[in-house]
Amino acid sequence: MTESTVAIVGSGIVGTTMAYHLANQGIDVEVFEKGPEYPYPHDRQFREKILYLYDNPAYRLPQDLQHLTLSGDYQRDLNSERIMVVGGSATVWQAITLRMLPQDFKTRSLYGYGDDWPLAYDDLEPYYGKAEALLGVSGTDADNPFAPRRSSPYPLPEFALSYDDAIFAERLRQHGIVLHTTPQARTRAAYEARPGCMNFGTCRVCPIGARYSPNYHLLRAIETGRCRVHSNTSVRRLVVDATGRARALVYQRNDEATPREHGAEVIIVAAGALESTRLLLLSASERHPDGLGNDGGHVGQHLTLHHLWSGSLHYKEHFQPGRFGGYTARSHQFLDPPNRGKHGGVVVDFSSQLFANNVVFHTDVPEHRRTGLQVVEVLNARRQWRDIVMQAESTPGPQKYVARSTQRDRFGDPYLHVKYEATALDHETYRFGRELFDRVMAATGADEGKFASTKHFTSGHHHMGTCRMGHGVRDSVVDQFGKIHGTPNLFVVGGSNFVSPGAVNPTLTMVALAIRTTEYMVDRLL
């Protein structure tokens, strides 16, 4: 059996954040990642995905290693939202880095729905600043009257509104709606060893490292000599000793037939809300027959997704979208609306981006018959359309959960089954989002609009709540630092800890929680 001081399951933005901080404290860390290596900087992926529209199978796991079953309202391919590579999902994210509101941490006390977190915004606020510094966030609150208080400035200045966003901001202002800039982990100027953004407009696959990728800090953790990464390695279960302490993890190389054990003083599970839940359920034993951390029955329960409903607006004039890099404009005016409690909060999100696959495939002409002229016609038509997204919070419910599937992977371990049915408050939030879409359409002078139906939403790859934090076994899986109740050296950290999702993108909160937990470990356990 091999050993280390700390073992981390998952190399995504949470696991990497913790590995980087621990390694720089002189602590030995072993990181186990189910997926393959993912080169950094991502210039190779840029050439493949953007220039050649090639989805390289070398960066995908086969179905007998990455799969889930799904039932309920969610009509998207939830499995494809889990990017299992070294670096995780934040290797291909949009880098939107937003703070939750203080109100988001106490929706039960303030509005009568959901549950309150065991910590407050003020407890997390200093760590939001540390997370922004780590990721190199460009932003300002000067144009956003709805931003929560902060004790430290953004490390980089904001990206100005794009040409089309500036036009919309003025039209919306005249109708009482504030459009402001978007904080994002994309470098407005050179930052540390990362160059300033060159506005390629392909933020999900940034070839130069201007858009933050966890691999940036994972490489630096490895350079300390204190961090080692095991790619293409599945962690199959966790082992707890007779005293209740986590003793080891059982892992297996994806191409090998024999499992092995790795012992550690502290084990951290940071594999995303879905896969972290699966690992706890697979770790059932005589001591924990329903799964590790599941003595109160909360593992896999309280699942929430963000509900993103997309719309398009058509105008007589040309707005020239796609001329200014990534996202620049949004409105947080409706994050904490007057009737919150009757419905949830909503982010009004504008996108000025154009994607290669939208241009090439945004036509009914068979692919083999497309000409350059047909592609130009598609581009011309796109100049008169603007995309808009209503990104909404959701609430936990009895029909939102993760459990073991009846189907099994190549090792014989059950896959996940995800059940997701919207709650009554979710449906009311859709109606509120639709009203906002109609307001924006009228205020900006659109002559046509299209908006998704209530069931046609995407999660934004935001999966939360399945190992939520709380005060004890009766209401949660972990405490406010991610430590599993009753298992003093086992932590689950990430979006799975969220008690409620709010409406803003969760990544900055996840990183802030990771930094806070790492400091707790160094002070108390290591």
Can you annotate each of these PLM segments?
Residues 68-82, 86-89, 117-118, 296-416, ...:
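FAD cofactor-binding and catalytic pocket of flavoenzymes
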Residues 24, 31, 35-46, 224, ...:
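Glycine-rich loop(s) and the adjacent beta-strand/alpha-helix scaffold that form part
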